[in-house]
């Protein structure tokens, strides 16, 4: 432990010195609006997952026929500024220029309660009152989690402290419902009106972060997402609302390198490293590798330049009778061949038995399933004077064993325990870390939306989904092991067993009717056929207000 503390302390000192000596991003005035050139950038302050800024930078990149590298959320203001400043403003139309200036003002926040050369402090009050109804018990797990994550707390107090531009401490305190209480509506608002409905595990967002103009290091918790998709990322998806992590990143306008560790629950870790880079302005590639670990913390997996697979952690003995390591490998590709048009794809794999393995180890390899999945999509965004119009379609395939590994301890699954909850509800709930819809699935999704990003927006989405039984069997099984015991089980195809067919239509929108006062509403209906015949509804309407 003392070695770990010394390592982190040395890293903090190095980053501080590098930050002081590095050229400040805000001092490079190329492509920077005049009204933000004199405003220092708080390098280390985090921009949280699903913030509008990520959508703005993504749209501006599409408009300039460029791949967007700012798609790993959350991110520091320094990282976001690198990719915003890299946008070729001469290619932007009037709408793009306006959004570009808005994004810069947003990044160079000025309205701190306390601000001087070495310290900034800010605290705010956020309030939300929602009316809602949900047939949560009938819905897919992914939809339950999505609705919960999108519902704001009735009372929240975000707090941030910047100790110089290079060190940030932040937390998001809130009074809100727990997950199981939200599934019961109790009674049809977002307010926890009973003690059993109160979420006592706050804060779900908290961090300490240090950063300069080219690197950052963060220890914290919150939601995470990698890549702009409709059905959820195959690298790391935002389905889980509170994931503890530590992450080291290096960023440049043409490349982003990250090495991270995520804690799924005590003694369960996910180590990842990745590189996301541009081959040309309009072609981008992401290489992603990870390993799940059960047991003691292993420093070997923190090495960003090591091929994790070649450590062979699963071959080093069992922990409590269980294989201690699982694997994850991913490749992403994006092409922006024309203004506003993007083609993209993601591939994820946990296991794949090669011809060599099947020939030389036939008995063992016959019991190991090929667990893999992929998605591909097309997106087109067009700007109008007052807003943007976006159309996106996506196809997803996940075979029956994607993210289900030799035992549940190393499967790519995040677990949460609720100490306070309504009676007759489970103690815990789970969320897939990637592919939120789950394994054994084929899905097609289309979405059309209008967006001004900072003021109003609306979208209409349709999803058709076919899902086999293997994901449900995984959750329903007892014990720590759910894995093939016969070659027939290892070779099942999607959709396995008696399939489920789901048609889902959703519409939602928001409008900032007055400064800091926003109205939101949405409606969703899912029609189930196949092994279940039912209809599920989810609807909400609410008002949100921020003091500042």
Per-segment meaning from a language model:
Residues 47-63, 76, 83, 87-92, ...:
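Structural signature for solvent-exposed beta-strand/loop edge elements and short helix-capping sites
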Residues 275, 534-548:
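Outer-membrane beta-barrel "beta-signal"
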Residues 214-216, 225, 236, 240-426, ...:
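Signature for the C-terminal beta-barrel architecture of outer-membrane proteins
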Residues 1-50, 55-57, 69, 74-105, ...:
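Cleavable N-terminal export/targeting peptides
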Residues 149-151, 169-206, 228-232, 355-367:
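Surface-exposed loop and membrane-interface regions of Gram-negative outer-membrane beta-barrel proteins
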Residues 69-70, 142-148, 158, 193-197, ...:
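Outer-membrane beta-barrel domain signature
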Residues 119-125, 169-171, 182, 215-217, ...:
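Transmembrane beta-strands of outer-membrane beta-barrel proteins
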Residues 25-37, 47-49, 53, 105-155, ...:
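Transmembrane beta-strand segments of Gram-negative outer membrane beta-barrel proteins
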């Amino acid at each position: 432990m003392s070695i770990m503390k010394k390592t982190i302390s040395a890293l903090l000192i190095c980053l501080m010195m590098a930050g002081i000596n590095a050229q400040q991003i805000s001092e490079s005035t190329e492509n920077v609006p005049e009204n933000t050139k004199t405003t220092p950038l708080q390098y280390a302050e985090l921009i949280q997952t699903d913030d509008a800024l990520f959508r703005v930078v993504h749209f501006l990149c599409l408009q300039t026929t460029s791949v967007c590298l700012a798609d790993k959320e959350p991110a520091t203001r320094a990282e976001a500024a690198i990719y915003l400043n890299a946008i070729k403003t001469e290619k932007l139309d009037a709408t793009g220029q306006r959004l570009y200036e808005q994004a810069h003002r947003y990044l160079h926040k000025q309205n701190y309660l306390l601000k001087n050369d070495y310290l900034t402090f800010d605290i705010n009050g956020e309030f939300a009152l929602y009316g809602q109804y949900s047939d949560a018990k009938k819905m897919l797990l992914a939809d339950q989690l999505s609705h919960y994550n999108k519902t704001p707390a009735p009372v929240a107090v975000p707090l941030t402290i910047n100790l110089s531009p290079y060190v940030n401490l932040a937390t998001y305190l809130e009074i809100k419902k727990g997950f199981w209480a939200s599934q019961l509506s109790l009674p049809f608002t977002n307010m926890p009106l009973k003690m059993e409905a109160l979420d006592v595990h706050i804060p779900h967002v908290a961090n300490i972060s240090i950063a300069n103009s080219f690197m950052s290091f963060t220890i914290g918790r919150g939601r995470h997402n990698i890549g702009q998709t409709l059905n959820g990322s195959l690298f790391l998806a935002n389905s889980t609302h509170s994931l503890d992590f530590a992450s080291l990143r290096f960023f440049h306008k043409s490349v982003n390198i990250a090495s991270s560790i995520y804690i799924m629950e005590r003694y369960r870790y996910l180590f990842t490293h990745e590189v996301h880079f541009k081959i040309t302005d309009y072609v981008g590639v992401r290489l992603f590798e990870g390993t799940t670990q059960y047991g003691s913390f292993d420093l070997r997996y923190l090495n960003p330049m090591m091929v994790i697979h070649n450590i062979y952690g699963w071959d080093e003995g069992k922990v409590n009778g269980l294989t201690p390591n699982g694997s994850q490998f991913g490749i992403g590709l994006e092409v922006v061949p024309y203004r506003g048009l993007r083609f993209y794809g993601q591939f994820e794999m946990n296991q794949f038995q090669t011809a060599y393995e099947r020939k030389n180890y036939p008995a063992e390899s016959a019991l190991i399933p090929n667990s893999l999945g992929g998605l591909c999509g097309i997106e087109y965004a067009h700007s109008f004077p007052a807003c943007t119009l976006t159309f996106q379609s996506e196809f997803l395939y996940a075979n029956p064993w994607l993210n289900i590994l030799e035992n549940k301890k190393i499967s790519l699954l995040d677990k949460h325990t609720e100490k306070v909850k309504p009676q007759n509800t489970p103690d815990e709930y789970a969320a897939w870390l990637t592919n939120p819809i789950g394994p054994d699935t084929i899905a097609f999704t289309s979405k059309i939306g209008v967006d001004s990003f900072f003021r109003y927006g609306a979208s209409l989405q349709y999803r058709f989904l076919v899902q086999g039984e293997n994901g449900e069997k995984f959750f329903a099984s007892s014990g720590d092991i759910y894995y093939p015991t016969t070659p027939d089980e290892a070779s099942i195809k999607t959709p396995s067993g008696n399939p489920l067919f789901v048609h889902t239509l959703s519409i939602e929108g928001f409008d900032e009717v007055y400064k800091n006062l926003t109205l939101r509403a949405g409606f969703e209906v899912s029609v189930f056929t196949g092994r279940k015949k039912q209809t599920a509804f989810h609807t909400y309407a609410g008002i949100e207000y921020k003091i500042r």
